[in-house]
Amino acid sequence: MTLAAITYTRGSLSILNQLLLPHQTTYDPLHSACDAWHAIHEMRVRGAPAIAIVAALSLAVELDALAANNQLSPEPKEVEVFIREKLEYLVSSRPTAVNLAEAAGRLGGIVSAKAEVRGVDGREVAEAYIAAAQRMLEDDVKDNRAIGEFGARWVLENGVATGSESGSEKGKVAVLTHCNTGSLATAGYGTALGVIRSLHATGSLERAYCTETRPYNQGSRLTAYELVHDKIPATLITDNMAAALLARNRAGSAASVGVSAIIVGADRVAANGDTANKIGTYGLAVLAKYHGVKFLVAAPRTTIDMNTKTGADIVIEERPKQEVTRVRGPRAGEEVDGLRAMETITVAANGIDVWNPAFDVTPAALIDGIITEVGVVEKDASGAFHLARIFE
């Protein structure tokens, strides 16, 4: 059973507080768009697909509550304006993640179309929104499984399978991933981690490697948590060990399996294939190119922004300096009522300036393929992606 980052029933929404993982499993209820804005901005929920779904469902829950308390306007246009303003507010919580903006635009269009229908009232407009938001949750899991299957097949056909000379079972692959792209970042199963899950399910995965992913440690806190939960053979490395991992194949050690592919997620893919993802992704792509390792981006089509021509047009969110200068976690070995006391530790010199971009942009030239729910997009002979074709 995979982890659930989002639990939803009609009128009720809770998220797994990812700031407390892997030490505590706590679900936070969200009752409104305002609750979701803070949860997203504080990164209690993260991952581009999950952010969009939580934002959409939070407003669905708020609309349900307003209707139940007879506080919803009977005027369809007033409800339309209310929904659009809330969606615009939600988009401001994490501007780099295109899924949220895409969902807001799509949901806003559905609401506007419903409001134009002769004879409808405000409640029917709200119902149209709620139904569309709920479909997002269902579609995301289905799309993620398709991404996993397409990606696994591509890696097995195009990656370099590990061989018996390195102590591995012939025909299996080892994959390196970055940040967290699994059930905790989506409605379920995951994108890049979904590919790893699919490889594992078919017995084709030798080992998964996950980076620590500084400064927020989504790899060590979240991806490692999912891999252990699913009993997938995995090894954690710090971010600055990736080059050594790709360069060496030491028999008899934990790092004895050669890496066949690097698979990452995305927060926004530009029309030319340039990809914004968690800081450190660009460096991994450079390392992959140098070492002849396949580099893949796994993302649903909702992450592809055809209105953004290149990565130069992507706005990169910058995070607080405390995320770099401080580390938070439980005190080792001491428990009170079954819980270990959480502490925040300073790890940098006071007064030092900090630059903390949340994302970087990987040029399309370094990407071998973009795995979507309708297949893997590869570049043509001239080295260009043609992403518009998957929307036809």
Swiss-Prot record:
<comment type="pathway">
    <text>Amino-acid biosynthesis; L-methionine biosynthesis via salvage pathway; L-methionine from S-methyl-5-thio-alpha-D-ribose 1-phosphate: step 1/6.</text>
</comment>
<feature type="site" description="Transition state stabilizer">
    <location>
        <position position="179"/>
    </location>
</feature>
<keyword id="KW-0486">Methionine biosynthesis</keyword>
<keyword id="KW-0413">Isomerase</keyword>
<comment type="function">
    <text>Catalyzes the interconversion of methylthioribose-1-phosphate (MTR-1-P) into methylthioribulose-1-phosphate (MTRu-1-P).</text>
</comment>
<dbReference type="InterPro" id="IPR037171">
    <property type="entry name" value="NagB/RpiA_transferase-like"/>
</dbReference>
<dbReference type="InterPro" id="IPR042529">
    <property type="entry name" value="IF_2B-like_C"/>
</dbReference>
<dbReference type="GO" id="GO:0005634">
    <property type="term" value="C:nucleus"/>
</dbReference>
<dbReference type="InterPro" id="IPR005251">
    <property type="entry name" value="IF-M1Pi"/>
</dbReference>
<dbReference type="InterPro" id="IPR011559">
    <property type="entry name" value="Initiation_fac_2B_a/b/d"/>
</dbReference>
<comment type="similarity">
    <text>Belongs to the eIF-2B alpha/beta/delta subunits family. MtnA subfamily.</text>
</comment>
<keyword id="KW-0539">Nucleus</keyword>
<dbReference type="GO" id="GO:0005737">
    <property type="term" value="C:cytoplasm"/>
</dbReference>
<dbReference type="InterPro" id="IPR027363">
    <property type="entry name" value="M1Pi_N"/>
</dbReference>
<keyword id="KW-0963">Cytoplasm</keyword>
<protein>
    <recommendedName>
        <fullName>Methylthioribose-1-phosphate isomerase</fullName>
        <ecNumber>5.3.1.23</ecNumber>
    </recommendedName>
</protein>
<dbReference type="Pfam" id="PF01008">
    <property type="entry name" value="IF-2B"/>
</dbReference>
<dbReference type="GO" id="GO:0019509">
    <property type="term" value="P:L-methionine salvage from methylthioadenosine"/>
</dbReference>
<keyword id="KW-0028">Amino-acid biosynthesis</keyword>
<feature type="active site" description="Proton donor">
    <location>
        <position position="267"/>
    </location>
</feature>
<dbReference type="GO" id="GO:0046523">
    <property type="term" value="F:S-methyl-5-thioribose-1-phosphate isomerase activity"/>
</dbReference>
<dbReference type="InterPro" id="IPR000649">
    <property type="entry name" value="IF-2B-related"/>
</dbReference>
